[in-house]
Amino acid sequence: MRDRVRRIYRNVSDGLDLIVFLNSTEPHIDRSFFYATGLTDGLFEGCGAWLTPDGGCEITTSALEEEAAKKSALPLHVFRSRDDSTKLMKAALRGHKRIGINASELTYAAFERLRKLASKSARFIDISEAVVTTRLVKDAAEIERIQRACDIASRSFEEVLPFIPSGVTEAEVASELVYRMQKNGATGPSFHTIVGSGPNGAEPHYTAGSRKIEPGDMIVIDFGAAYHMYCSDITRTVVVGKASEEQRRMHETVARAQAAAFAKMKPGSTAKSVDAAARSLIDRSKYKGRFIHGLGHSIGLAVHDGGALNSTSDLVLRPNMVFTDEPGVYVPGFGGVRIEDDVLITKGEPRFMSTAPRDLREL
């Protein structure tokens, strides 16, 4: 993990002598703790990763997580009480004057604790942007885990399709999909599965309710697998029965928009130019203004892992970044279509990591 730590330091402009990733209680767990330590399981509430400029990393861990922490092969400092934790943190901070913190993931209470334990002359510097910049470019191990998460989710989607036309509820479809993903090797879902049938498909972040799926429904299914903390994020839209002309037109429009964006996902392209490729196509159709969110986001240890593909981002794409490509069209009262895939930026052509069928399936 030394290379990851060194990369973070290289992306920080300030001359820091220490970086701290400090967890609070669930859900306030900093995924960068796992990035720096290489750990892929455990909760690690109240635990910290202490990074030094030479690439070193040590962990302060509760006794509860000691066995999990040993898998990192990093130096451990184990606490069994809050007093123990305070002593270890004070020792780790001693002598350090310029300390980097991931302020976007650090609670105010945790920051105040750090501030009180550090020397009065210590200065804390927010390195959130540098952390995002570092995590945007994945290493080989990360790409392998994301690919595994994509493979699991893609396979599970195909397995669940025969289950859908049987008059089940949205929640039952979501449960079946999560079951299939875990049966196929996922360590869990990467987020709450979205199953929006009929008019519910017009809500991009609808979850999955008690509505029973009916013949003629168009269904937006947004799902992802977690594989040792790394995420996939895929969306497919299907129809129960034969698709209407309008349903087919919506799907074809979104499919063309996704393909236009995919063709632009190469090193040197800006995020906003990729977004524009999809958005301009939709806005030239009858669905102008119905694409109501950004085109995509980075994925990795988090489903939304930092960078975004949207109309205002100047982010420049680089090899080994992984983004979603997910245009959508939403018509209140009628429904929606979204097609989402996970895309690896390479030195040449982009590559779809997710392989679930993208065509409009009539179930």
Where are these regions (language model features)?
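Active-site neighborhoods and metal-handling regions in enzymes and metal-associated proteins
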Residues: 1-363
